[in-house]
Amino acid sequence: MARTLVVKATAGIDAPERCSQAFTVAATAAAAGVPVSLWLTGESAWFALPGRAATFDLPHAAPLPDLLEAVLAAGKVTLCTQCAARRGIGADDVIPGVRVAGAATFVAEATADTAQALVY
């Protein structure tokens, strides 16, 4: 069984390189056929909203909407429940395919025998 790559993005426009790294690694793994679970936490939670990824710009980086689309197509994208609540984001507000789940789900995914977790 292939290992699942669990990527936790904690940064958004406040730390663009770290944000881009998380999305790039997740999308690259998905493109390589690795099972991927991308978690949007902290300031990256905003990218669960339609159109928000398009507002992100980092020179010499792949467009965030393309990276997010790649992960959505081949893996899972999860918005942190508490992060969403702190930002007034509801489950009906997010991009289709994004689920909302909390710490217990993250811990279960990240500690599975077949998982490798990365936090950016």
Can you say where each PLM-predicted feature lies in the sequence?
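N-terminal beta-loop-helix "entrance" segment that forms/cooperates
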Residues: S44-L58
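Histidine-anchored nucleotide/phosphate-binding helix
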Residues: C19-A32
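Residues at the starts of beta-strands that form the adenosine-phosphate
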Residues: T4, P35-S37, K76
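Aromatic- and Gly/Pro-rich donor/ligand-binding loops
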Residues: L118-Y120
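Small/aliphatic-rich secondary-structure junction motif
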Residues: A32-F47
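A short aromatic-anchored loop/beta-hairpin motif
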Residues: R87, A91-I95, V100-A108
